[in-house]
Regions:
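Intrinsic low-complexity/disordered segments
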Residues: 1, 17-19
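Bacterial N-terminal signal peptides
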Residues: 8-16
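Extracellular/lumen-exposed scaffold segments
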Residues: 21-166
């Protein structure tokens, strides 16, 4: 009986070791990214704007270290652009959004291709038109985050802003 238990433990240990060794030896391109909060909305949380008149509001975001996101005008038609939107019916309309110019980078696996991306902190200038009153706006930032080896699936985060139309 003791011999059977020892053999069973040995087989399980070898299986776990083999699985761990495969994981360590797999190429970086096939490992999933573990970062889940690639982009964070920083501020403002609340803005006051004249009711019915277009007003510029600077929306501040931070990208996690080691990651980048495609700019609003990516260098390839197959890359997903960063976009900001506000849903209809919120009492606030996004009249226009001005995005920063992207930085040009090359990836280690393809130094011939230049990408237009955002890294670190970036600001989107949103021209908002609000009706009179207090509006909790649930804006949406849509982006795709990548590192030097691979990209995560596209993601949309909520950008909550209390817009007061006076």
């Amino acid at each position: 009986m003791k011999k059977q238990i020892c053999v069973g433990v040995a087989v399980l240990s070898l299986g776990a070791f083999a699985a761990h060794a495969q994981e360590l030896g797999s190429p970086a391109q096939s490992r999933p990214l573990v970062k889940t909060d690639a982009v964070t909305y920083l501020f403002p949380e609340q803005v006051s704007v004249p009711a019915g008149k277009p007003s510029q509001v600077a929306l501040h975001f931070r990208i996690a270290q080691g990651l980048h996101i495609n700019s609003h005008t990516p260098s390839d038609e197959f890359l997903i652009p960063t976009t900001f939107s506000i849903p209809d019916g919120s009492g606030v309309r996004l009249d226009a959004a001005t995005y920063p110019a992207g930085s040009s980078i090359t990836l280690t696996y393809d130094p011939t291709t230049k990408l237009s991306v955002y890294t670190g902190e970036f600001i989107i200038q949103a021209r908002l038109v609000a009706t009179a009153g207090n509006h909790l706006v649930q804006g949406k930032l849509h982006y795709q985050a990548c590192d030097q080896n691979q990209c995560m699936p596209p993601k949309t985060i909520t950008v909550a802003i209390d817009v007061i139309g006076k």
